[in-house]
Amino acid sequence: VVKAGFNELRLVWKDIKSRLVVRRYIASYFMFNMAVQTVMIMATAFANKEIVGIKTQDLIVSILLIQFLGILGSVVFSKIATRFGNRLGLSIAILIWIGLCLFVYFFVFLPWQFYIAASMVGLVMGGIQSLARSTYSKMLPETEDHASYFSFFDVSEKIGLAIGTISFGLIETFTDIRTSVLALVVFFVAGIILLLRVPIK
């Protein structure tokens, strides 16, 4: 079963390599989603190390804010994409993520500031996740086996998460966790540059 799964993913990758638009989009998604997933995984560690006086209930409130505002964010970015196109919607989301990393690095030291950051994460998280998948779905070939293509999409997400988390940890080891957050900007910038090379609306 495992071997069959790998063979299926290999065939999907072979097909994707022959499709310029999909290949470029996957590269862009890999970069910006690597940073997005790393933020979600490492947010609690950052709060515990860097936020003065933060308590468990503060983290719970932050998680609730992210979940609630994520719904709103998906609606807002869906409207943006409908009016201006998916690429612009994704570009706006990535730019907000870049701004968020800079905001956290320079200004987030207290619980109420962390709440603001969590609210921003929620809004842009819901938007970028829904737009990323819908954009990918529009690029897929006419086939009944879309599940294999989305399996490949999900695998790239998991690989990106692993690389992002390792990179975050290495940077923290040699500097500090706040610098690790700032370094995520590199992934977002790479993601938006690659996205602008994708010939889609």
Each predicted region: which residue ranges?
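Multi-pass alpha-helical transporter architecture, strongest
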Residues: 182-201
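A membrane-interface helix-boundary motif in multi-pass transporters
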Residues: 170-188
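Intracellular juxtamembrane helix-capping segments at the cytosolic ends
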Residues: 127-141
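Short amphipathic helix-loop junctions that connect adjacent transmembrane helices
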Residues: 41-58
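Juxtamembrane intracellular "pre-TM" segments in multi-pass secondary transporters
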Residues: 1-26
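Helix-loop junctions at membrane interfaces in 12-TM secondary transporters
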Residues: 105-117
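Structural signature of the two symmetry-related core transmembrane helices
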Residues: 88-103
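Helix-to-loop junctions at the C-terminal end of transmembrane segments
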Residues: 72-86, 172
